[in-house]
Every structure is written in C-alpha cells, then in structure tokens.
C-alpha cells in the first residue's frame, strides 16, 4: 500500500503484513494485519509509532516518499507492543538526532526492550509538542491494553492517533478512514 495523505501535513506511512498468520502466536490473521504509522509535518516533523521490525525498510521507503530527505525530528511512541515499536532502534540509526517522545513508562520500556536511553522527551497528561504549524498533545490511556499506552491529538486538524484503542486486525487494502474501509466483514464480530 502506498502512502496516503490524510490531511495537509498528515500522512499514513504504515505497512500491510499479509505474511504473519498469528498475532502473538494465538489469534489467527486470515486477512493480515496493518502496522499503522503516521507523519505529522509542520516546520518540524513527527513520526507517530513505527512498524514491526521486519517491515522497517518499507516504513523507511514510505517516509522518504512522503518527506524526501527532510529529517524526522520526533518519534512519538504511543504504544510499546513490538508491532508498534520494534523499528525504533533502526529509526534511531537512520535519524540519529531523532528525539523519542513518550511517557515515563514508555521510556523505561524502550530502554528495557531496545537498550535506548537518552535523546528522549518525557511527556505527561496534556503536555504539548509544537511542530510549528501543528501542535500535538498527549493523553494517557493506561491498560488499553498495555500500562504505558497513550494517544496523540492534533487539535488544529481534529485528528486522534489512537494506537490500539480502536484497532482491528486486517490489512487495509487502500482504505485509511472508516468511510474507505469495507466494514461488512466486521458485523458478526460486533454483535
């Protein structure tokens, strides 16, 4: 799936995975899974979440397609589950000056999982990050479904980057917003 401009300055740069057959070795993935990552660009650029590390080169290609050779200033980590975070170390190698943004629990987990300390920005409930033309705010939603989970809100664009809070399994097949996704397959599960 190619990158998609959601709104001016906001791009979906995630990746579809049609090869993984089970999530956490338990749940079947007959329709694949998407690893959702987003770029928010003002004067500075933030990447929100990453992808599973074996798809890191595709993420890098998507990023470059969206922003060319501009650097990413911030990596916002909403959720530490490896399908969201396991490309962090690779991104740090590509963008050595990137600052990793997360709450206290997230930053502890990044150090524990990936050995990365330093070059971080700790955020608390309601803190903001000004990208120059776009402002992100951070809101904690612990235990949805890990203890460090947070969401990121871009108020000027009225856009919520929700991590797993409203997620579902399945590759996106070109649809990013709910009006673009075929929902018939989900009705039985919702009942």
Language model: regions and residue ranges:
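Short, structured coil segments at secondary-structure junctions
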Residues: 94-96, 116-117, 155
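Conserved beta-strand hairpin/beta-sheet module of binuclear metal-dependent hydrolase folds
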Residues: 3-65, 151-154, 158-162
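Metallo-beta-lactamase
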Residues: 4-8, 101-191
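Active-site environment of divalent metal-dependent phosphoester hydrolases
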Residues: 80-85, 107-110, 145-146, 167-170
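Active-site metal-binding motif and surrounding structural segment of the metallo-beta-lactamase
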Residues: 43, 54-101
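Short, flexible loop segments at the rims of nucleotide/cofactor-binding pockets, characterized by
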Residues: 23-28, 51-53, 77-79, 136-142
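Short, conserved acidic/polar surface loops in the N-terminal third of protein domains
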Residues: 59-60, 85-90, 111-114, 149-150, ...
